[in-house]
Amino acid sequence: KSAEQSIDGAHLRDNESLYKVYDDSGVETMYLTVSRGNKSEGTDHSWSEINQYSVDDYAAMRTNRYQVNGLLQVGDEQGPVSGELGYGEKAPNATVQVRGQSSSLNKQKNYKIELKSGKGKWRGQRTIALNKHMGEGLRFRNKMAYDLIRGIDQMMGLRTQFVHLYVKDETSGSNSFDDYGLYTQVEQ
């Protein structure tokens, strides 16, 4: 039997190179077009339906959270930009659902956008969590905390980015993007 190794004196270190790949100091702009999918993928719902229910409602209904199809495109304030995720695409590249527990009770929701396999990644990520932070008046403390954690030895942080989200709800017949405001994207 080998001797047990002690972790006393071992130091946890974050990988600083992960934070140097992208500039997270500004605001990214995302355009999300939502549409009704199909029953086999569980995306046969409207945008209104997925925003209507809380985690408690789903528990009472004994069903998984509703999802819709989504086409996620990254750009600037003028629209999607060539070379960025989803540019020029017409078919959905993601599924979208409300995320969070108690936050699912808020009027403005947090979203989980899951990019479909083979449809690309955004900053190396297929799961994009967008948090609204409705209970936090300034709405920047969460990002600030993660940014500060980067500089503390033996603490692991997550990459974060402010995101300005625009949503076009094709499930209601809309043909234009509505401004959903500022979100914080947190690495999953």
Pin down the residues of each PLM region.
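Phosphate-handling architecture centered on phosphoinositide signaling
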Residues: 2-188
